[in-house]
């Protein structure tokens, strides 16, 4: 049975992490009878174990539900679950583009957080109808009236009809569904027009190849059609179209306004880009849907297998992850210290942690990761512009005209008691103050422009610890700016460890170098000979510590006796240590590579 276009509603849920988005989605599935009681698990839509454990949504999911509204009609509701995290902003923006409305879920005790705001602005840019939902009203600390006021003050949404709900107890779920039906507009579009469908996610299926999640904007999609991707110009023949009713179910066609999936024996996730438009090869649409852009990684790091024989396994694992995650990029690289590995690019720190954890968990690899770095832009004296994602590749100082680094606009929301300490932190991270705004009586929104390289180290951890966990952060790229940057090398026993090189601001280089060598001295196990640990910029050593040698008591056998006898033994030991030092290698523990991240200056 097919639903007429005016009875289709496409909506998504916007919320900050932990405001109860996935639980609310569970309740909605339960209310509409999409799943039997037996199949209900917590967070049905978060399919990966990792998502469940961390309580975050990483990949998008889309579900088709049927709901009989109070007017007696049956409506088709397509719920698109979105990730709430900064790193996945582009994915969120694409899934918002596939909807006509959004539920804005706000925690009744915590109020609005930074990422809620960021996503609301994205939703407003896409002209979505926003339905405010105050969640967790069953909590003793809930203050729904204050939160309503906050939403009105900060976002300017009318909250007189906001739904008070509790995803835990199931209160208010019926009202939410009624509001979805009455307030959100049905999809526009003409089912006779040339096909236009927006891809908002994809995943790889071992039997069917790549499966694209799509929203049909114009026209109709049926099995057997030849389709063309408008950004990559690739053509395929559709084998199956279907929907998720959380389980994959195949249907005869997807009509205008519907959300579903399409399989067309596509072998490579690269061909199916999020945000791209699918059209018919015979009768193509005149223009693609707006808003597509290529995803650019922001953070890079090196991944090396602990045991070099695992190199091929690591490559296979990355290939497989890449099938599901088009935003991951990687290329082989070698390091003198760590052997063969890959240089990988990620959307952000959370994305990086998740990929590392999936490699270790799903593919059983043990990895060494180098400190993350951002992409610097270097203009050489010859006028060439280079993008450097690995500090080891930075040209020599005398060949560099200017170095630029990426800046972000960071929005931090904090209770007003912590404003001082947060401003202090941002200035310490070379932040430039741009704005401060009071939201209600107790909360402040601070806006800073900060170099991305300062944020990827330990900004978030420090922010949380200085504000007792109350602050929330959101950031977006604002472009490149010129900075005084230098490359700092770490030398062990006189040899440069390329994996520990980092690019630092020249004012910070000394303190950073000092802190790093002290940290390394405590982490590197003592050897039979002494090891100098040095930080150098170019040829100039700026800091040094020494890992002292262990020594055997060679005088144990001499009872009394002549001093020259003892001296002979000590000289012999000293000579042995000197020879050992020339040939000796130093084993470096994994903690040493992560030390770069956690040093307090």
From Swiss-Prot:
It comes from the Bacteria. It is an enzyme of class 3 (hydrolase). GTP binds at residues 18-23, 135-138. It is a peripheral membrane protein. SUPFAM superfamilies: EF-G C-terminal domain-like, P-loop containing nucleoside triphosphate hydrolases, Translation proteins. Its main location: membrane. GO terms for cellular component: plasma membrane. Residues 6-188 form the tr-type G domain. It catalyses: GTP + H2O = GDP + phosphate + H(+). Keywords: Cell membrane, GTP-binding, Hydrolase, Membrane, Nucleotide-binding, Protein biosynthesis. GO terms for biological process: positive regulation of translation. Its EC number is 3.6.5.n1. GO terms for molecular function: GTP binding; GTPase activity; ribosome binding; translation elongation factor activity. It is found in: Cell membrane. Required for accurate and efficient protein synthesis under certain stress conditions. May act as a fidelity factor of the translation reaction, by catalyzing a one-codon backward translocation of tRNAs on improperly translocated ribosomes. Back-translocation proceeds from a post-translocation (POST) complex to a pre-translocation (PRE) complex, thus giving elongation factor G a second chance to translocate the tRNAs correctly. Binds to ribosomes in a GTP-dependent manner. Belongs to the TRAFAC class translation factor GTPase superfamily. Classic translation factor GTPase family. LepA subfamily. This is Elongation factor 4. It comes from Desulforamulus reducens (strain ATCC BAA-1160 / DSM 100696 / MI-1) (Desulfotomaculum reducens). The gene is lepA.
């Amino acid at each position: 049975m097919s639903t007429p276009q005016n009875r289709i509603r496409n909506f998504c849920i916007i919320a900050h992490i932990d405001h109860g988005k996935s639980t609310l989605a569970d309740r909605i599935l339960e209310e509409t009878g999409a799943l039997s009681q037996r199949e209900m698990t917590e967070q049905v839509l978060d399919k990966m174990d990792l998502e469940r454990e961390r309580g975050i949504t990483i990949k998008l999911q889309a579900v088709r539900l049927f709901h009989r509204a109070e007017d007696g009609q049956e409506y088709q509701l397509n719920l698109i679950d979105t990730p709430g995290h900064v790193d996945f902003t582009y994915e969120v923006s694409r899934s918002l583009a596939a909807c006509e409305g959004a539920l804005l879920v706000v925690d009744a005790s915590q109020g609005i957080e930074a990422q809620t705001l960021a996503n609301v602005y994205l939703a407003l840019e896409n002209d979505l109808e926003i339905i405010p939902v105050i969640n967790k009203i069953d909590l003793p600390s809930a203050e729904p009236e204050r939160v309503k006021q906050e939403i009105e003050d900060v976002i300017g949404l009318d909250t007189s009809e906001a739904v008070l709900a509790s995803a835990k107890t199931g209160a208010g779920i019926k009202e939410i569904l009624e509001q979805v039906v009455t307030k959100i507009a049905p999809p526009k579009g003409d089912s006779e027009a040339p096909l236009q469908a927006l891809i908002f996610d994809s995943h790889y299926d071992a039997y069917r190849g790549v499966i694209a999640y799509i929203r049909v904007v114009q026209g109709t999609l049926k099995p057997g059609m030849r389709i063309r991707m408008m950004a990559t110009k690739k053509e395929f023949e559709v084998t199956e179209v279907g929907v998720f009713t959380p389980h994959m179910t195949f249907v005869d066609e997807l009509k205008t306004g519907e959300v579903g999936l399409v399989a067309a024996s596509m072998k490579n996730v690269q061909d199916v880009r999020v945000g791209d438009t699918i059209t018919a090869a015979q009768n193509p649409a005149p223009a693609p849907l707006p808003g597509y852009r290529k995803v650019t990684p922001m953070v890079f790091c090196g991944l090396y297998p602990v045991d070099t024989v695992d190199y091929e396994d690591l490559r296979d694992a990355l290939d497989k992850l890449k099938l599901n995650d088009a935003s991951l990029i990687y290329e082989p690289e070698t390091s003198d210290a760590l052997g063969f590995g890959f240089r990988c690019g990620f959307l952000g720190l959370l994305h990086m942690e998740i990929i590392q954890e999936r490699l270790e968990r799903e593919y059983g690899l043990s990895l060494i990761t180098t400190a993350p770095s951002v992409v610097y832009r270097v203009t050489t004296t010859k006028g060439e512009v280079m993008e450097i994602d690995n500090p080891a590749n930075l040209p020599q100082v005398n060949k560099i005209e200017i170095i630029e680094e990426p800046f972000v606009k960071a929005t931090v929301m904090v209770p007003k008691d912590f404003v001082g300490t947060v401003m202090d932190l941002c200035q310490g991270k070379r932040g430039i103050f741009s704005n401060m705004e009071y939201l209600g009586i107790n909360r402040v929104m601070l806006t800073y422009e900060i170099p991305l390289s300062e944020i990827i180290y330990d900004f978030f951890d420090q922010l949380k610890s200085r504000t007792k966990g109350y602050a929330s952060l959101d950031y977006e790229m604002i472009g490149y700016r010129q900075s005084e940057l230098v490359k700092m090398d770490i030398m062990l026993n006189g040899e440069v460890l390329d994996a520990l090189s980092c690019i630092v601001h020249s004012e910070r280089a000394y303190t950073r170098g000092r802190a790093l060598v002290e940290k390394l001295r405590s982490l590197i196990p003592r050897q039979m000979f002494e090891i100098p640990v040095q930080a150098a910029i170019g040829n100039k050593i700026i800091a040094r510590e020494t890992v002292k040698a262990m020594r055997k008591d060679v005088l144990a056998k001499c009872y009394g006796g002549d001093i020259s006898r003892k001296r002979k033994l000590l000289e012999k030991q000293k000579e042995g240590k000197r020879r050992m030092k020339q040939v000796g290698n130093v084993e470096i523990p994994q903690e040493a590579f992560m030390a770069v991240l956690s040093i307090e200056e």
